[in-house]
Amino acid sequence: MGQRLSCGCFRTDQLVTHSGEVVSLNADTFEEFSMEEFDIPPPPPLPKPVFKQPGPYKIPARSQRCPSKRRDPY
């Protein structure tokens, strides 16, 4: 799906900027650095998760009818 055309037009070791400048990505392009130069503090430790024990199982209570609204069957 277009791969035949894209292989000849795209190189993985070059970039083209908005101004049209071609930047080659090779070992000479990059500077050597060390992560120790950045002086980044270590991340704070993650808090320990708190697990709550489930309570005892309770049987749901039936809804109580209001006795004053009950009709007398007789």
Swiss-Prot record:
Which residue ranges does the record annotate as region Asp/Glu-rich (acidic)? 34-40
Q: Where is this region: Disordered?
A: 36-74
Pfam family name, one:
UL11
Localization per record = Virion tegument; Virion membrane; Host cell membrane; Host Golgi apparatus membrane
Keyword Lipoprotein assigned to the entry: answer is yes
Motif segment (Di-leucine-like internalization motif) = 15-16
- Describe the processing and modification events after translation: Myristoylation and palmitoylation (probably on one or more of the nearby cysteines at the N-terminus) enable membrane-binding and Golgi apparatus-specific targeting and are essential for efficient packaging.
A biological process from GO: viral budding from Golgi membrane
Q: Give a Gene Ontology cellular component term annotated to this protein.
A: host cell Golgi membrane
For this UniProt record, the keywords arranged alphabetically read as follows: Host cell membrane, Host Golgi apparatus, Host membrane, Lipoprotein, Membrane, Myristate, Palmitate, Phosphoprotein, Virion, Virion tegument
Q: What is its main location?
A: virion
Query: Which residues carry the N-myristoyl glycine lipidation?
Result: G2
Q: How does it sit in the membrane?
A: Lipid-anchor
Give the protein family.
Answer: Belongs to the herpesviridae cytoplasmic envelopment protein 3 family.
Sorted alphabetically, which HAMAP family does this protein's record hold? HSV_CEP3_alphahv
Subunit info here reads: Interacts with cytoplasmic envelopment protein 2; this interaction is essential for the proper localization of each protein to the assembly complex and thus for the production of infectious virus.
Role according to the record = Plays an important role in the cytoplasmic envelopment of tegument proteins and capsids during the assembly and egress processes. Also participates in viral entry at the fusion step probably by regulating the core fusion machinery.
Q: What is this protein called?
A: Cytoplasmic envelopment protein 3
- Which species? Equine herpesvirus 1 (strain Ab4p)
